Amino acid sequence: LKCNKLIPLAYKTCPAGKNLCYKMFMVSNKTVPVKRGCIDVCPKNSLLVKYVCCNTDRCN
């Protein structure tokens, strides 16, 4: 699986076991992702942070 880094022109291949890509947004500003990368389990959203997870190459 390949996931985009913070700047979507760059991406990385995920290590074994991390088979989801994710984007993290601040709830107050949903237009600009704060973090992107590979993850094993999609984190729960909180009052401050929203996560979007997916499982295809460069989907984040």
Curated annotation (Swiss-Prot):
InterPro entries: Cytotoxin_Cobra, Snake_3FTx, Snake_toxin-like_sf, Snake_toxin_con_site, Toxin_cobra-type. Disulfide bonds join C3-C21, C14-C38, C42-C53, C54-C59. It comes from the Eukaryota. One of its GO terms (molecular function) is toxin activity. Its main location: secreted. Keywords: Cardiotoxin, Cytolysis, Disulfide bond, Membrane, Secreted, Target cell membrane, Target membrane, Toxin. The keyword Secreted applies. Expressed by the venom gland. One of its GO terms (cellular component) is membrane. It is found in: Secreted; Target cell membrane. The keyword Cell inner membrane does not apply. GO terms for biological process: killing of cells of another organism. Monomer, or heterodimer with alpha-cobratoxin (AC P01391); disulfide-linked. Monomer: shows cytolytic activity. Belongs to the three-finger toxin family. Short-chain subfamily. Type IA cytotoxin sub-subfamily. This is Cytotoxin 2. It comes from Naja kaouthia. The lineage of its organism: Eukaryota, Metazoa, Chordata, Craniata, Vertebrata.
